[in-house]
């Protein structure tokens, strides 16, 4: 009886962390199309070097300046 309980406890302890924690590969990329292009906002024509953000078109240039 005790050995069955030990086996059950071991199985539960081994399986729980594997299903409870997301792996890095499961995390969605926030902007995969920009990462694939090796995007640097400093090279964007809308990048404001003084404010260190983009003044136009937030879909293309990130970080966006607050209005």
UniProtKB/Swiss-Prot annotation:
The keyword Lyase does not apply. Disulfide bonds join 53-65, 54-61, 58-64. Expressed by the venom duct. The modification 4-hydroxyproline is found at residue 63. It comes from the Eukaryota. Residues 1-20 form the signal peptide. GO terms for molecular function: ion channel inhibitor activity; toxin activity. Transmembrane segments: none annotated. Keywords: Cleavage on pair of basic residues, Disulfide bond, Hydroxylation, Neurotoxin, Secreted, Signal, Toxin. One of its GO terms (cellular component) is extracellular region. It is found in: Secreted. Residues 21-50 form a propeptide. Pfam families: Conotoxin. Belongs to the conotoxin M superfamily. The cysteine framework is III (CC-C-C-CC). Classified in the M-2 branch, since 2 residues stand between the fourth and the fifth cysteine residues. This is Conotoxin TsMMSK-B022.
